[in-house]
């Protein structure tokens, strides 16, 4: 998808780097990355999908302005899809549906699209939420586009849809206020707080109080 420099090392399960996550093939702890595209910084959060990690899911969703609902083109919505999608719809997020793995043998992207629509309707999505854009593609082969039968050369279509449909964060003036959703540690920088600035701005070297 041309998101990495030529000298960067990439691999499978880049965000699911916890040993247990790799072993079980699921996301347990939320991860966040960012990319710059057409002059806009896009922050991407990978959230757990299982109800066993509901607290983590709710904390992460409060950081987001929109969501990508990733669905397998063969399997369709999974049981855990219902849990996370319900949480996202309840707080008013409008989803972009991404039907992935259309390169799979016997995949059924059109039927899966209808299954996603029915699921959202069943979860009492608003008319605006039901009017969701849908993207088809193959993450394995590095492409996303509007038509599953016509592969593109990259994932730029997905990024363009994010810029078009996900609203920019609201800028509230005042003293800095940040909701911390997770803590990390680096041997180079020490403790790291990850979260969202809800009011004011934070600058490098600023003294802040953590409460």
Q: What would you call each of these model-derived segments?
A:
Residues 1-71, 75-77, 84, 111, ...:
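P-loop NTPase switch module centered on the Walker A-proximal segment
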Residues 50-51, 74-77, 101-107, 139-143, ...:
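Conserved nucleotide-binding/hydrolysis micro-motifs of P-loop NTPases
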Residues 54, 105-110, 148-153:
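Ordered, soluble secondary-structure elements with a strong preference for glycine-centered loop motifs
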Residues 54, 78, 113, 155-159, ...:
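Hydrophobic face of alpha-helices
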Residues 59, 84-87, 196-198, 211:
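Short, solvent-exposed amphipathic alpha-helical segments in soluble enzyme
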Residues 61, 66-129:
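Conserved C-terminal guanine-recognition region of P-loop GTPase G domains, centered on the G4
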Residues 121-211:
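Conserved catalytic-core segments of large NTP-driven translation/proteostasis enzymes
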């Amino acid at each position: 998808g041309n998101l990495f420099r030529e000298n960067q090392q990439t691999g499978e399960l880049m965000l699911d780097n916890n040993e247990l996550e790799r072993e079980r093939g699921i996301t347990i702890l939320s991860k966040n990355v960012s990319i710059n595209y057409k002059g806009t910084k896009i922050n991407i959060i990978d959230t757990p999908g299982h109800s066993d990690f509901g607290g983590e899911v709710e904390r992460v969703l409060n950081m987001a302005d929109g969501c990508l609902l990733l669905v397998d083109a063969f399997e369709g919505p999974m049981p855990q899809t219902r849990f996370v999608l319900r949480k996202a719809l309840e707080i008013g997020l409008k989803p972009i549906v991404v039907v992935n793995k259309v390169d799979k043998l016997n995949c059924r992207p059109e039927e899966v699209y209808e299954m996603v629509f029915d699921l959202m309707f069943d979860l009492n999505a608003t008319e605006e939420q039901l009017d969701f854009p849908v993207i088809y593609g193959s993450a394995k082969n590095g492409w996303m586009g509007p038509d599953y039968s016509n592969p593109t050369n990259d994932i730029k279509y997905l990024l363009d849809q994010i810029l078009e449909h996900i609203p920019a964060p609201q800028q509230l003036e005042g003293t800095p206020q940040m909701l911390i959703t997770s803590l990390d540690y680096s041997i180079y920088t020490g403790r790291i707080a990850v979260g969202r600035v809800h009011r004011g701005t934070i600058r490098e070297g600023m003294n802040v109080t953590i409460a």
